[in-house]
Amino acid sequence: MKVLALRHSVAQIYADTQVYTHDDSKDDYENAFLISNLTTHNILYLNYSVKTLQILNKSGIAAIEIQKIDELFTLIRCNFTYDYIDDVVYLHDYSYYANNEIRTDQYWVTKTNIEDYLLPGWKLTYVGYNGSDTRGHYNFSFRCQNAATDDDVIIEYIYSNELDFQNFILKKIKERMTTSLPIARLSNRVFRDKLFKTLSVNHDKVVNVGPRNESMFTFLDHPSIKQFSNGPYLVKDTIKLKQERWLGKRLSQFDIGQYKNMLNVLTTLYQYYDMYHEKPIIYMIGSAPSYWIYDVKQYSDLKFETWDPLDTPYSNLHHKELFYINDVQKLKDNSILYIDIRTDRGNMDWKEWRKVVEGQTADNLHIAYKYLSTGKAKICCVKMTAMDVELPISAKLLHHPTTEIRSEFYLMMDIWDSKNIKRFIPKGVLYSYINNTITENVFIQQPFKLKTLKNEYVIALYALSNDLNNREDVVKLINNQKRALITVRINNTFKDEPKVGFKNIYDWTFLPTDFEMNGSIITSYDGCLGIFGLSISLASKPTGNNHLFILSGTDKYFKLDQFANHMSISRRSHQIRFSESATSYSGYIFRDLSNNNFNLIGTNVENSVSGHVYNALIYYRYNYSFDLKRWIYLHSTGKASIEGGKYYEHAPIELIYACRSAREFAKLQDDLTVLRYSNEIENYINKVYSITYADDPNYFIGIKFKNIPYKYNVKVPHLTFGVLNISEQMLPDAIAILKKFKNELFGMDITTSYTYMLSDEVYVANISGVLSTYFKIYNAFYKEQITFGQSRMFIPHVTLSFSNEKTVRIDTTKLYIDSIYLRKIKGDTVFDMTE
């Protein structure tokens, strides 16, 4: 949802839009909670409170002040990510398709012939890093830019088996126009930039597990971040290959040679970061014009020095000349060298051309070895061709996508590799490598071992759920890693499947109850965004590919109502209750009935079950930004930091009742996952709360009334307001609590409206209006370690007779309290108070 704050209402009516006017009788947190549970996508928030907007944004719900009608029109028609700290809106708006336009934020693409393969009459537009060049389109009171591009489609095409780009992009645009926006993926780039900048400032050592090509620009300015990936393809790994011949296959209709060069250099750069944790000088021989350098410089201040007879316009220092072996001495330490020398074929026949290519490859290797033979902190990536050759066994092979698969690949070596044992590699083996291998990642660092790191902050986004990892080791890492942000795939199956398929692999599934740690926040993508200064206009949908975000060691942990809070917890319930359910009271009725409370009069205002916990359990797939376990734990320890005003603390027994209702719901729905989740949350409640039951009571609290509107034959009809099991030494503490609640007890609005048989020969009158106070007193007794209340649900009633009688219904009648007392069962009254 998105909340657009206005000082005045607007005349125009928008689809899927609701107006909410700030309620001055409620505090900012309660207003935020009410807004978050509205069911429309667009909320026009009138007479707004800035504090309420802050609360929503911290909860991951985009809430923005609107000053102009143009701002309203722009934001209401598309989705966006909002940086609420810096007041920047990143639109995810593809309406530019209506201008016959596709967009990119990678400059090198604009220098290709891609426009020859677009839809007829269409063009390509460069929009800058995260759409920064579009800022001029929006003269708004906040900074606004459209981060939507088609780079995801272009890159997917490059790695696909499709050759016809026009058909490919047509299909993808049609898909985009007919499916839900994958907003988490679109906003992820904004999030990653913010995340790693924040963590790099706050932590000395940061470890990142499983980066992919989407992050290849993100880490350019973070050389100290340690990367773990799937490891490199080494020369010695070719021993498994059978020999093949030249294949010759076109991968792309438009020229992607620049993309290949960029990937080669970035792969080498990240290998240098991994070894030396600082930025090198980047030397490049050949590969002009290298327009992609412009892209790299949008993210970092890396320095390039280049040699090529052709221009390289974005190099810091370009030598418009050939590079010779003697020029190697000009290259400094703390550098990487990219060698991409290859003469144009011209009119040479293939045999003559082959000799030239192999000769140049030998020359390239000679330059590489000479560069690595002296000095320190150097890595080289050199262009190779399939030929009979000796290569160091520990050198890395690279074969990033290029326009055509022919004979070309690349070799990456550091100083140690260049001096390592060499092995003869036949030409046919190298063809086998070229024909069958595409390097899919610029990050080729070693795999991560699932062990805790003492001094590091560990980030593992979408990296650990793969069933190649041992599930128990993943859980152990999350439980024990003190500082981390780790995601795992949430179990939103209905049959409690332990693993689910994803693309061509399987992922383990997890629930919050699979982990045992305090001090960590378990939330959704949206909830995590709020913690890092971002919010989003479209909540994650339960697609089957959703992830828990687990933050350990965060200073936000105790701020219970600010981050990963209960906002939107009833939204799914409202959507169903007010559209397709039998009654809008269905949730209240079901919760009472499933706990054997059959007095449904006033069930919507006096419910005996925690609606928060019930909704968090049965609709966890729709809103798991609310960290239920943390909420339970912090209340059980009394350590919750509450910023808001009015805040109702549930009695632990209300939470137990909610689990029982959720369990009943799960059985009716045949939802095995909710069934397990409910059981495990109930077990967790019993673990963190020391709940004792007065199932063998020796005292009770009685309430005597001045008026009873029914016939009765008991001596003194009274409401048993709970039973206790206490020693005589605890009587003063129990009496003190009753005295403390005197005004609230006598202020209860108690009513009755019918009689019924509670059991055989127990004839009673119903009582309404006491549950809220009962649970407050329950909490007070619990905190003083006084055993109060039974294991079965408290059903307030007044016993009228110990015989079978017919039900009587009367108009709702108010009952007036005469006295409240504490009495020993089958004994004397030890305390009595009147108003």
Curated annotation (Swiss-Prot):
Paired cysteines (S-S): none
Function statement: Multifunctional enzyme involved in mRNA capping. Catalyzes the formation of the 5' cap structure on the viral plus-strand transcripts. Specifically binds to GTP and displays guanylyltransferase and methyltransferase activities. Has affinity for ssRNA but not for dsRNA. Capping activity is non-specific and caps RNAs that initiate with either a G or an A residue. Together with VP1 polymerase, forms a VP1-VP3 complex positioned near the channels situated at each of the five-fold vertices of the core. Counteracts the host innate immune response thanks to its phosphodiesterase that degrades the 5'-triphosphorylated, 2'-5' linked adenylate oligomers produced by the host cell IFN-inducible 2',5'-oligoadenylate synthetase (OAS). The host RNaseL is therefore not activated.
Protein name: Protein VP3
Family: Belongs to the rotavirus VP3 family.
Quaternary structure (record): Interacts with VP1. Interacts with VP2.
Cell location: Virion
Cell membrane among keywords: no
Organism: Rotavirus A (strain RVA/Human/United States/DS-1/1976/G2P1B[4])
Residue span of region 2'-5'-phosphodiesterase activity: 693-835
GO terms classed as biological process: symbiont-mediated suppression of host innate immune response; viral process
